[in-house]
Structures are given as structure tokens and as C-alpha cells.
Amino acid sequence: MKISDGDAGEYSSTSLRRVDLENRHITSVKEFSALTPNFYQPDYGSRMTSSIYVRGFGSRIDQPVVGMNIDGVPVMNKNSYDFELFDIDRVQVMRGAQGVLFGRNTTGGAINIYTMSPLDFQGKRLTLEYGSANSVRLKASHYAKTSETFGWSVGVHYNHSDGYFRNYELGKNCDGGDNAALRLRMQWLPSENLSVDNTLSAGYVDEGGWAYAHYNPETRELAPVAYNDECSYNRFTISDGLVVKRYFDNATLSSTTGYQYVDDRMELDNDFLPLDYFSMGQYQKEHSLTQELVVKADDLGIFNLLGGVFGFFKHNRMSAPVHFKQFGIDNLILKNANEEYYYYLSGGDRKLSFEEDNFVIADDFVIPAFGAALFVQGGASFGSFDVKAGLRVEYEYSSMSYDSRATVHYSTYKDLRDSNELNTVFKGSRAVDALELLPSLSVSYGGNWGNVYASARKGFKAGGFNTQLFSDILKQQMIGELIGNPQDVDASSTVYEPEENWTYELGAHLSPLSNGNLDISATLFYIDCRNQQLTVFPDGESTGRMMSNAGRSFSNGVELGVRYLLGDFTFDAGFGYAHARFIEYNRGDADLAGKFLPYAPRETYSANVAYRIPVPRSFANIFVLNVGWNGVGRIYWNEENTLSQPFYGLLSASLVWEKGHWGASLWGKNLLDEKYNTFYFRSIGNDFFAQGKPLHFGVSLHVNL
């Protein structure tokens, strides 16, 4: 693992090579948590859940704080962030706002993933694995180089798991599932100054999840997972990225074209109780297209220049029906309606009742979005000093057409069943746009010993729409119409504004030993955030959640990383501290200024030792023991800071053997079976927690031909 790479003088980053990923059995971006200082992606929910927190800031739903690029192509929907990492050459995690080069939704950084190249590696790779929870993992790939200028590869993988958490109401595990993927890559060098690189991939997910257990705040006890409707997540994705580069004497022109299709379906028992409250679905089909043109000139005397244009278009068609059942009808609708009915009609001789024991609030949305950006970054070198300045001008527009509707039949008298039909409809459209100026400035001083730097960068997170609020809006409209007191409702609360931040850094990347065996990285940072986007639950027995803009918040802290090679030993260690609080946030019912930001850990720790055990070559070419420990905490679960997860640490280990074309590994995670929570939320007045995976282990067999 490298603690910095690339233009290390300008930002803080961590890179993991293929050998790091495979020897440590890292198969998902979620396992980067704490390996990268102040980076945390909790494992809960399903593969749809990609909540990432960096330096105290993050997002549970909608827009991410971290962008993701695979072979240079941006991933436009964070529902696709959690996928199987197979045949990955390296991963780079950049921390801090990356607005100039990457634009929207990179206020916390960017994750750059690079797959294996058929021009650099040729052969066949096969992996067979079996582990805890009856988990099976199969991987197969072929890399070929038909000439010095053309290479191609094909790779597939399949995973299965029975799951780790049992739903005691349904009598079976709730988080098992299957996923598979296919990747095709072609690289062509038609001439010395032209390259063409195309990657086509498809993925499929069919799984459960949402192992949420009810928490009793009075007894502080966590009940077993028990809800009566099955939860599931299905996802089909197609992605294609085409990168064409033209090389000139002093410059490079790059064109990157990306297309992505996401078709996913989520089904939830949204009350997560063994009661017939309500369930919901979310079905979406999203197409996205991106195009970027970049000119990079590095040999202009003391100057260097990078500039380009970027554009994107997304079209999302979504349905989010909410299925109310008998207990939910009685307690969430009729109870409130009858209380209001008695208030408006004195005497108490009337009572509302529904003929249906269940009904559906249908919510359909069409959400197109497009954006365009111009960016430039220039630098100059003055001896040991380097100065860089950049600016990105970005505009984006998004609209939402909504159609919410429900039909029920009701009566109003206790004794006489006078049937009435109520058709409630809420239709309309909203739009939001933003024009952002994203500057950056950095100064670095370096030599053979490393460098020190100072930087200031601005980033922004796009605004959007609270689609999950529409069932609540229609429910309130329905209650008003039932009691003869219709209310004027609008969709203004469904729009949230962009989030902006400035990241200021002082840092150093040092290699004090002449042999390069010691790398040290240190960073001090301060983040000033305006209009922070927070996921909140409306007051009362709400069925939805919403994104809200807080007034202002900040985070300051430190990041440290060390890598040391000593003979057959490799030591890696990292530490992150983020002191993140609200400066201004009046929620209406409480002034939360000074409270810690929720869901992000205050500290992260990591330590890993790899020991290449000396053995006769007749036994093994490689025999490596890896022992790692990651620590996270404290994490506050709400804005009031009344609930929190104390600090916890997870121990992992692996033993890797390779001889010729063959290899095997034994691995284990959470070896001490630590009990900890990864997520908390409230639903219709109830508290729930998701727990971390228990001790799990497995064995892998590898063949490389």
C-alpha cells in the first residue's frame, strides 16, 4: 500500500495495488474504511447502500461526497458504487475537494479504480473460494496480446452467500444473495501517437439485506431482527467507457466517453416490525451519458497546462409505491383522521372506516438532468517551488415530474355503511439548477526528500429532490379530504439545494531514506461547509425521509500515514482525526449549533504487517502472512448526539501461498468477533440499528497460467 502517489504535492491520497487488494482479501470499496485515514463506508443495508463519509462529512442518500471513476470514466449513480473488485490493478483514494478536475459530488474526494490491462498482463486467472455463511466466489479471466499494438481481455465473476443475519419472524436469513459480472476490455495502439481503450461491463445483483433490529431506548436492548415482509434488491447494470488519446510533441488530447444503464428494484418492509404497517418499493431505470475532452501540456518551459470541457445527461424513470396494510391504515391514517374528524364535527357520532384492508399510494417520477463544465489548471515551477491554480465553471439543471395518487373507499357512520370513493391525486413538476465556480490554488516545495504543500480547493454537491416525501404529502392530503378540510399542499419541501465547501490543507509527503524504504505522509485540514445536506426524518409517524440543508458546519483534523520496508517485513499504519461540528443549524425544534456531525467517525486507525516468511523455493515462491487491524469511533447517530457507537477495532489476517502457477490463501475477518453497530435510523417513531458482520473466514485457491 502506498500512502500517496500521483501529484502528491497537491492533495492527500492513498493507493492500494493489486497485491494489497488480493493478499488482504479486499473485495469491495466498503473495505477501504479506515485503511484510508478519515475514510469510512459502513457495511449495512444492501449493495444499493453506498454511504461514504470523509473527514466528517458524508451522505446517506442521493448525492455522494466522493466521486468514483473506473478507468477514467465517472460512475454517475452511487447505487452502483458497491460492486465486486476483481482483476483490479490499483485503487487511488483522493481526499479533500476535487472540484477543478472532477466537478460535482467530489467535496470529500474521488476514488479512481484502474482495471488490469491486457497490454501489461497476459495469461489466464482462476479463483475458487469458499467461506463462512456458505459463501462461494468464482472468478475467471483471460488476457491476450495478439500483437504489440492490440490486446483484449474477458473476465467473469460469481458470488453467493447465505447471509449472516437471521430474520426470526420469517425464520430464515435476510441478507443472503447472489451477484455476477462480466467485463470485456480492448486496447489498441493504431500508431505511435494514438491509443484507443474500450471497456464494456455488465453486472447483476439479486440479494436480500436490511438486517435492522429494533432498539428499546428505555432498556437499551437490541431485539433480534424480526419483520414480516421480505426485503430484496435486484440490480442490472451496463457500462461502457471509451478513452481515445492523441499524443503530440508537447501535449496530449484525451477524449473520454461513457454510457451507463442502471435498472434496479428495491422492496422493503419499511416499518421493519412484525406488524402490517406498510411496505414500499423503488424501481428505477436510469440512462446516463458523459463526455470529456482534455488537453494536457507538460513541457512548456517552467509552465504546465491542463484544460477541458465536460458534459453529462441523465434520465431516470422511477416508481416508488407505498403499500399500506391494515395496521398502518388504522394507526397512520384512520386514527389521525378520526381525531381530526371529531374535532371538526362535534358530537362524536361519526367515524371513518375503509372498506379496503390494504391500498397503494403510487408515486411515479421522471427526473432528467444535464450539466456542462469548462475547467483549466495551470502550473509553474520556480526551482524547488511549484505553484498551481485552477478554475472550473459548472452548470447543471435537473427537473422532476411527479404523479402521486391513491384510491380508497370509505364510510363515515358507525352503523350505516355509506360507501364513498376517494381519489387523491398530487401531480406537478419542480426544477432546480446551479451555476458553480470552483477555484483551487496550491503551493508546494520539494526535493529528493519529498515535499510540503499548502492548498485551498472548493467543491460542491449537487442539489436534488426528496422523492420519498411524496407518500407523506399524499397521505396528509388524503386525511384532509376525508375530514372535509382539504389543505393546500405543494412540493417545495421536496427540493434541496447544493452543498458547497472549501477545503484548506497543509501537508507533507516525505521519503527520508535514500533507499526509499520509508514513506511518511501528514496532513492538517480545515473544511468550511455551507448548506450541508443532511438526511432527516420529518416529525411524527412519518413514512419517509428527506434531505435537508443545514446552515453551516466545519471540520478540522489531521491525517498521518507511514509505510516502512524492513527486510521481509512491510509495515503500514494510518491515523485520521476529524473534529466536525455544526456552526449554524436550527432545526426548528432545537438549535443544534455546536453538536457533532452524525454518522461519521471522529477517529480512524489502521495498522498492517506483512511478513514474507523465508521458506525453501521447493515449497513456495511466495509465503506471506498479513495481519491487520482497523479501528473506528466514536460515531454519533443523531444530530442531538444522544446516541453513539463507541470506538471499536477489527482484527483480520491472511496467509498466502504461491508456487508456480498455483496459489492458495486462508483469510479471516473480525477475528475477535467484535460486536458493533454500523447504522441507526428512526421509522414511525421506532429506533433501529444495523450490526456489523461477525467473525468470518474462508479459503481461496488461485491458478495463474
Predicted features by range, described:
Residues S13, K30-V73:
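Extracytoplasmic beta-strand/coil segments of soluble accessory domains associated
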Residues V29, S51-G56, N69, R90, ...:
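N-terminal periplasmic accessory domains that precede
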Residues G123-R125, Y130-S161, E169-E207, R235-D240, ...:
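Transmembrane beta-barrel wall of Gram-negative outer-membrane proteins
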Residues K296, I302-L306, F310-F312, S381-S384, ...:
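Gram-negative outer-membrane beta-barrel transporters
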